[in-house]
Regions:
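Flexible N-terminal pre-Rossmann segment of NAD(P)-dependent oxidoreductases
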Residues: 1-16
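Conserved glycine-rich Rossmann-like NAD(P)H-binding loop of the short-chain dehydrogenase/reductase
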Residues: 39-53
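Substrate-binding pocket helix/loop in short-chain dehydrogenase/reductase
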Residues: 102-103, 107-112
Length: 142
């Protein structure tokens, strides 16, 4: 059987990619794909233990990776973290959470926690990444 090359069809060498929620699931897949294409990947996550494990694994695999601990539901802290890690060329917003309970059993605090991450956090993180790219005169991708 012919072995297919793993070389990406494009290069992101020299690009900086921020992946929010990149310690598991789709976010981790995106982080690895960006790193395979040559990007320096910065992963933002709220759980330091998971973040440290992922960054260590990526660096062991030969990728350039950094981690920053921030909670996307804390809008001001998240914005400050994004401004700290500039410049950015690529932003992947993959943070998300779910509460697994029937709608009739969901209380307002549970609902608000999900919306703070999945809606408010996603919106304001994207806006902060766009502002960082504008401030640095970079044309990026969100």
């Amino acid at each position: 059987m012919t072995e297919l090359p793993k070389t990406p069809s494009f290069s992101l060498a020299g690009r900086r990619a921020l992946v929010i929620g990149g310690t598991s699931g789709i976010g981790l897949g995106c982080a690895v794909a960006l790193a395979e294409a040559g990007a320096c990947v910065i992963i933002m996550a709220r759980r330091k233990d998971m973040l440290d494990d992922v960054i260590s694994a990526m660096m062991t695999a030969g990728f350039t990776a950094e981690g920053i601990v921030a909670d996307i539901s804390d809008i001001e802290a998240m914005k400050a973290a994004i401004m700290e890690i500039r410049p950015l060329d690529i932003f992947v917003n993959s943070a998300g959470m779910a509460r697994h309970s029937p709608a009739i059993d969901t209380d307002p605090a549970q609902f608000d926690a999900v919306m703070d991450v999945n809606l408010r956090g996603a919106f304001f993180a994207s806006a902060a990444a766009a502002q960082a790219m504008i401030n640095d005169g970079r044309t990026g991708s969100i």
